[in-house]
Amino acid sequence: MKKVLLATSALTLSAGFASADVSMSGTGGAGVFGAAGADLSVYSGVDLGFALSGASDNGMTFSASLDMGGGQTLDTGDFELDTQDMGTDDNVSVAIGVSGLTITLSQNGVDDLYDDDIAGDIGISGAMGDLTYSVVTGLEDADPTSLSIGYSAGAISGSVATSDEGDASTVTVTYAMGDITVSAESDTDRTGADTSSVTLTYAMADGMSVSLENSEDVNTVSVAYSSGAISVAVEADDATAETWEATMAYDLGGGATFNLGTNEAETTFAGVGFSF
């Protein structure tokens, strides 16, 4: 999972009919990592992103993005290391905005709207009032087609995403009541398996939040606390094969963070990550 934090230095270009901004951003880090009880080993890596955006004199907007990196970077959310390609990615993404529509072109580089396990070549997205919509497809018969619709008004929001690859779909509804948020989800995956879940989250004023999820009779409790530079999170469930994880992050300033984590599978990491 690549997580690139946007924005930093920018260079403004102009060429008669249009102006464009070119920016570079990135993440990276180094530390130690051990999966499933294995000995700790050193990791290091960097993931860089380059983006160009601008507008023509007739109001058409455009953007293009390019990603490159090397080594391995830490994914604290999934307790894993992500391998970064040496050199640039195969696909460059180009997006064009016309009359409220955004059209994205990237060969096998536009994520399917149900999940990002597969991809298409063409993405179209837009909004009508409180509704947002997106379509991802391709020109070849074998290319998947997916559709998503979202709605948000006041305290309530909802979304539907579907893909013809395996007839997968997911429906989510969320309602916020002050410090309490309730969400429900129904999902049919690409193999036809159905799951549903209900999640209740309470955000306290002192930097602590508590979340309880029930999914197919499995309860998951998550507690997160943040104070100043430090953030701590713990999650556990009561599944037949119980799982738990604990993470800590300390903001070192200047875009650097120290991360520490462990889980029931005896996967452990400690390292410094940075963004710019």
Language-model-detected regions and their locations in the chain:
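Outer-membrane beta-barrel proteins
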Residues: M1-F276
